Each structure stands twice: as C-alpha cells, then as structure tokens.
Amino acid sequence: MEKDKAYILDDRGYIFIEGKDSEEFLQNILTNDVNKIKTNNLIFSSILSPQGKYLYEFFVIKYLNKYLIECEKDTAKEVSDFLNFYKLRSKVTIAESKEKYVSFAISSEKFNEIKSENKNQKNFFILDENCYFEDPRLKKLGGRIIAKKADLDLILKKMNLISDDKSKFFSYCFKEGVPSINLSKLKNNLFGVECNLETLNGLDLKKGCFIGQENTSRIMLRNKLRKRLLPIQKISGEILENDIIKYENHEVGKVMIDKPYSFALIKIVDPELHKFVNVELTCGKSKIKILKPEWIT
C-alpha cells in the first residue's frame, strides 16, 4: 500500500452492542476471546453455525463504552438479527448504527507515523472519537480508521492522506491471501477453520464454549484440517463459482468466490499442497494457479 493513500471502504456496516451482559453474551457466541478487548481494545472474530460452518466475520471494538462490530454492509442486518435471536434474556441492546460512519484502510507506515505523532504506544487509539487501529489479522494489511462520516475530509487533510480507489486495497488483500469482499459466498459452505481463522488471529480454542466450538475443536485438536481457503489466479478462460479444480486426475479444490478476486477451498493433504501449488491447474473450462500466502505453512 502507498504510504499517503487512504482507501475508503464505504461497504462496511456498524452494529453497537451495549448493556451489562454484553461481554458474557458475546463471549458465548464469538470464536475469539472477548476478554482480549480489555487489553487490546479490539479483536478480529467470526460467528459460526452450530456445526462449525463459517457464517460471518468482523472486527469487534470497545468504543464509547459499547462494543462496536464492523462488518460487510451487506451482512450487517443478518449479523444484527442473528445476535438478537440468541439474546434471549441477556440484558443487552443490539442495533445497527444510526450515525453515519466510514472506514478506510491505510498503510502500516502511515499508521505508525500517526501513532508516533500522537504519542501512542498501543496499536489501538481514539482521536476525537474516531478509532485508529492496526489490522489484527496481518500486519501487512496496515491500519484502519473508523470515523464519523462528517469528519472524513478533515481527517484526510489533517493526516496528509489522499483518497484512493478501494479496489486497490482489495487487490492488496487478495495478494496477501485474505478475502475482503463477497464473503457471503462463503456462508455455510466451509468450516470456519478452513477460512484460516486460527492463522488470522480470529479463533481462540482456550476461551471456552462458543457456537460451533465442538466441531472446530475436533478438527484442530485431532489434526484433521485437510482444506484451506486460498487465492487463485486465472491463467486463461473464466473462473466460475463452484468450478472444480483438478491436478492430474485428482480433485484438489472448488471455487468459493469467483469475482472479482477469486478464492477456492483447496486440499492441503492427499495430495500434499506443495506438489501442485506452483502448477497450472484445470478449473472448469479455465486454467489457474494457486497463490500460497507466506503465512500458510
């Protein structure tokens, strides 16, 4: 990412959770440990189905004495409805934000510069009621700012940032192996651990029970993780959703997200991933190759 560019993410939704049972309520649902927010002020987390299938992912932030969930705008209502369904007798209030917010991504270099200028030691801080934080998934994904929409132009000017096309950020995330848009195509189609939650700091098996915990623990603790969500790059033809990927006579994957940044659920054993990761593969009627991120061992 370019140092002085801000990638405006106008496709994000915001949900506030407040009430005396908020912490316990979220702890019983989310894949990550909500207690970490006391130290770090934020976490990356997910919600799974009772079977351990992927449903949603988001950042959770302690903001203005409430919990703020920042997620894809298209799924914000679904996430809010899901949480309200599980609320039962918990003393919590869950609602999409009525105030207008906007998120934007910035480079790690710029984030560290802002942090230093404001004499902050932590990777999360608030300036003028706007949130600044380092992406907890991967340091290479830089920093993020969640601001009141009315403050956007002022922040850009004050921080010497120039607004740029969000597609450049999505492309950067793709190259780092992290899907950023069209995540709804993953819903109920693969296990949460197959989405690399443990590697991207979105899963804590030591926290205790959460929705989908039983199957998730079984897969991880018994070393039964056999597939991972990985980026794929077109060589020729057109990649289509649900296309089967083949290596020699073996089915080694299936396309989950086709456009604009393609991701597939890929076998990592039987055959071993290293045998075909840099090989031209058949994908439906197209040819592709798998892009293995550095953080995948």
Q: Where are each of the predicted segments found?
A:
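Glycine-rich, small/acidic residue-mixed loop/short-helix segments
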Residues: 54, 195-203, 213, 217-297
